Amino acid sequence: MTPIPTDLNHFNGRRFNSYSNYFTKQFGGRVQKISIDAGFSCPNRDGKISTGGCTFCSNDAFNPSYCRPEKSIKQQIEEGIEFHQRRYRRANKYLAYFQPFSNTYKPLEELKSIYEQAFEAIDSHSPQFPPRNDMTSKALETPKIVGIVIGTRPDLVDEALLQYLNEIQKTHYVMLEYGVESVYDETLKRVNRGHDFATAEKAIHMTADYGIPCGAHFIFGLPGESKTMMLDAADIISQLPLTTVKFHQLQIFKGTKMAEEYLEHPEHFHLFDLEEYIDFVIDFAERLNPDIVIERFAGEVPPRYLVSEPWMKLRYDEVLARIEKRMEKRDTWQGRLYQDANHDM
């Protein structure tokens, strides 16, 4: 194995800035997200922005079986811990992850009530934070919940929400994750995203200004984007004050508008095969700011949801192992081609 350059020691022996290392530094061990469906909707579906939703969107494909809005947050946390302990058996700490749809799409007072059900799970038994005696525990009493992650759209945050989360993070870990998907406005319009990239930039900068950890999701392979365009996006993303990024290869989900377009005009789409994607995403990582944590290189959903062909039914861990092996073979790492005169590794 080719030694990691000495100036990349902060990668902890890997060739990219990994999510697991980030949370090991934060909490001293592996941390696993527990998805929670708190019954949120989306302005791109209910008519406020649009009624069609994003053409690629299928929330059911990403929701684990226990994650249902008719269940209380306490029950979902409890069942989520059990689910992940059976499946992974590696995590000893968990994040309550408000994932499906837009999890800031309610008035602030309602949001406080929802989020604090998860905060109370931390307060009940966690020794890591001081108790919040002003609240009565309604959620799972477990020492394993260490914080929350809130997934939402970049056009659904404002100063009042960020001020509230800024206060909360003095005693609890909080992260906001934005669905950005592309840096190109023409792409965002084509997939009916309902906002432009400038909106995402503004939200990310506002979040960072409040000192709140911030993540962003991007999809590789959206129609209309060439490989050069996608790689050039690394230079744009690298200038954002992001804590984490999550990458997904385009997958076509059954029942979506994009599935209809794909079946009618497959020539409009370039779907990566596994080997091509591995090299592509490494090329991308080479140009990415090494201070940005990579949560995921690729998406993983059950094949039954897909119109497009899955990658030999490989689990994400197997895909990641292949990516890291290829990085070793190419003797490369995240940020190798990143250029920023102000950056000091």
Language-model segments: which ranges?
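N-terminal [4Fe-4S]-dependent radical SAM core
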Residues: 1-53, 59-92
